[in-house]
């Protein structure tokens, strides 16, 4: 979508390709995310969010965060809104504080797991949920210059105030501790990889408050190193530390701490599917899982689905994106849902992906059972072999329209026919990066390797050189 030069604030804009993707507006700082463009985003958010209450702004540790937050503040106050800036905080702190304080909404400045050069803007409504597609569309319409109730140029009497409210993060820390009923982790050896990101604001603090024997990696905010060789997308530093220090579990967060992946004491990965199975089994045992239902996405492993069905459970799948998981959970009154990548949503804890909260839940559930994470993982399911390949496809139109590439579509059908009920093919365009994701899953690992290579090569050949 192309946004052309606008002038509701007297600020000229160049053209920029942008829209709300699977997790807000995201792009390269200085290319898409210029101060002028960000100011306009803030202004139109101010037009769309409810009139009553302040608008909260949080951010991760990226070097560009202060610039983005300042430009958003300028746009929001120009729209007459009162702004409370929270400073460095995990993404889930924003919706949690929106609900606690009765705010009109909130914005989180983060590009999640993306590299330091990128940034992004996530927008939450007064209910603490990410904005609906309809409201996102209103903001996009404003950015295109289509009238949606513009209040006119700001004047000396129409501008809203802005306040720094870093102290509000203490409410979020308190909520994290309350989520595990202040259960203790005295002496439990745990490693945390805080990714130089938003988890540094409170991750180590809450685990230490419960008495854990902590080793902390990448534990200071560093906007030039966030997500670089660490965190939930690069688990090797955490794996080395867990094994070398004899920890029984480790947790790695992404840049804004709305998701996490865990490792057991042997360095085995405990992904979002395993978290859903283990936590869901605990809720099931307590008869606290309505309809025995879990909500996951199309990326979740087939081994997980079959094991959950053997427990008498129902697994509902959604498109990729935690907003889809959220919508399905609300509609079906589900207690737990999430993504394989580590976004976990709990109805009892605000229905927002929260990496630190999920890590606390896993740690205390294991400790309460007298088990290490590895011992609990052994009670989980056997995953089908699964491989995900990211094919770089910079051309947005070709990437989003990959289904129209006949050779690639024919190969997908051939793979599905060859693997039958014991395999799956998933090809999807990323909503946040210039990537086409190709995922193959099957009971036969050789088939996984073969078809992953075939489809990735075809995608690279045809989508980047013109589909023929």
From Swiss-Prot:
InterPro entries: A-D-PHexomutase_a/b/a-I, A-D-PHexomutase_a/b/a-I/II/III, A-D-PHexomutase_a/b/a-II, A-D-PHexomutase_a/b/a-III, A-D-PHexomutase_C, A-D-PHexomutase_C_sf, A-D-PHexomutase_CS, Alpha-D-phosphohexomutase_SF. GO terms for molecular function: magnesium ion binding; phosphoglucosamine mutase activity; phosphomannomutase activity. Its EC number is 5.4.2.10. Mg(2+) binds at residues 112, 254, 256, 258. The active site is at residue 112. Its cofactor is Mg(2+). Binds 1 Mg(2+) ion per subunit. Catalyzes the conversion of glucosamine-6-phosphate to glucosamine-1-phosphate. This is Phosphoglucosamine mutase.
């Amino acid at each position: 979508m192309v946004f052309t030069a606008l002038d509701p604030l007297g600020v000229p804009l160049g053209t920029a390709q942008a829209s709300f993707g699977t997790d807000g507006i995201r792009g390269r700082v200085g290319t898409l995310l210029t101060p002028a463009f960000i100011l306009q985003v803030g202004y139109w958010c101010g037009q769309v969010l409810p009139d009553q209450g302040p608008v909260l702004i949080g951010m991760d540790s990226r070097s560009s965060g202060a610039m983005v937050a300042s430009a958003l503040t300028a746009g929001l106050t120009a729209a007459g809104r009162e702004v409370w800036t929270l400073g460095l905080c995990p993404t889930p702190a924003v919706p949690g504080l929106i609900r606690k304080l009765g705010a009109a909404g909130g914005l989180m400045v983060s590009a999640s797991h993306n590299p330091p050069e990128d940034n992004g803007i996530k927008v939450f409504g007064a209910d603490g949920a990410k904005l609906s597609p309809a409201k996102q569309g209103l903001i996009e319409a404003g950015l295109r210059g289509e009238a949606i109730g513009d209040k006119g140029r700001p004047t000396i009497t129409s501008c809203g105030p802005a306040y720094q409210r870093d102290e509000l993060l203490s409410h979020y820390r308190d909520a994290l501790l309350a989520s595990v009923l202040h259960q203790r982790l005295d002496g439990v050896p745990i490693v945390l990889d805080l990714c130089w990101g938003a988890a540094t604001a409170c991750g180590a603090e809450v685990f230490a408050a419960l008495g854990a024997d902590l080793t902390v990696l990448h534990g200071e905010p560093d906007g030039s190193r966030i997500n670089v060789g660490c965190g939930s997308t690069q688990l090797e530093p955490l794996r080395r530390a867990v094994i070398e220090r004899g920890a029984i579990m480790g947790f790695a967060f992404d840049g804004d701490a709305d998701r996490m992946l865990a490792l057991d004491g042997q360095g085995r990965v405990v992904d979002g599917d395993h978290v859903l199975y283990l936590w869901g089994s605990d809720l099931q045992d307590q008869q606290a899982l309505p309809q025995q239902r879990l909500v996951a996405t199309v990326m979740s492993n087939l081994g997980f689905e079959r094991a959950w069905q053997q427990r008498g459970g129902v697994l509902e799948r959604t498109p990729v994106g935690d907003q889809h998981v959220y919508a399905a959970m609300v509609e079906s009154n589900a207690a737990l849902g999430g993504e394989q990548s580590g976004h976990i949503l709990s109805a009892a804890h605000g229905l927002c992906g929260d990496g630190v909260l999920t890590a606390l839940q896993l740690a205390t559930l294991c400790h309460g059972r007298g088990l290490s994470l590895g011992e609990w993982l052994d009670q989980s399911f056997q995953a089908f072999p699964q491989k995900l390949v990211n094919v770089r496809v910079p051309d947005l139109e070709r990437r989003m329209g990959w289904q129209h590439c006949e050779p690639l579509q024919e190969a997908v059908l051939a793979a599905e026919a060859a693997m039958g009920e014991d395999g799956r093919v998933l090809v999807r365009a990323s909503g946040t990066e210039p990537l086409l994701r190709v995922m193959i899953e099957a009971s036969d690992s050789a088939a996984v390797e073969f078809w992953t290579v075939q489809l990735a090569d075809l995608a690279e050949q045809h989508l980047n050189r013109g589909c023929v």
